[in-house]
Amino acid sequence: MRADKGAVGTVAVVCAFDLSDYAFVPLCGTREQSCMKAVPGFVPCVEVRGCESTAGVGRRCAFERAVTAAYALPGCHQVCVYADAASAAKVARFMQCATPIFPSLRVNVLDDMRVSAFFAHVARVCAEYAQLGEEPEAVFVLRADAPFIDSVASAQLYAQHREYLAEYSFADGYPEGLFAAVVAPGLFPILATLTQDAHICFALRSFLRALKQTLILLI
C-alpha cells in the first residue's frame, strides 16, 4: 500500500484550463438546454433534437460528466477544480444552475500558470486534508472537458498503482481522456520544488503532457 500511515481516501483534481464553451453544451442536447445560453453570441454549431433516450450519452455536458466521473473514482471524498481566470468564469456560470448537483465542488483559480505553481497548490490542498486527519492516499487527475472518463477502468489503474507502490500511474497507449491519472500526494511538493526555475507554463490542457514535459526537462 503506497499511502502513508493515516491516509484516508482519495482526492480528484479536475484541470479546467483553456476550456471551450462547448464543454458546457449538453451532449446530444439543444442550445436551449445549455447553461451557456446566456453567453453573448454563442451558438452551438450542431443541434440534435429528439434523442433524449440515446443510450450511453445522455444530455449532460462534458464538464458535468467529467466532474460526475471524478466523484465516482474509488475513495474520492473531495473534487477540486483548477482553472485559469477565463475558464473559471465559465465554470461559475455553470455552477449557478448546477450547485444542487455539486454542492461541495471546490474551484481554485490559478493566476500563475506555471506548472510549479499548480504542483505547489495541489500539495497545499493535500497538506490541508492531512491536518484534518484526512490525508489522501492518492490524487486522481483528469481533464474538465473529458466526458468519457471510465471510472471502472480508472479504478483498475488505481489498484495497480497501489499494488506496485507507484508514484505516478497512467494508461499508456490509450486515447487521452478515458482514464484519470493517479499521482502519489508526496510527489507534488517534490515536483513543485524541482520546477521552480524551469518556467514551464501550463498552457496545455493536458496534465499528462505537462507532467511528461516536466519530467523530460528534469532528466
Swiss-Prot record:
It comes from the Bacteria. This is Uncharacterized protein TP_0284.
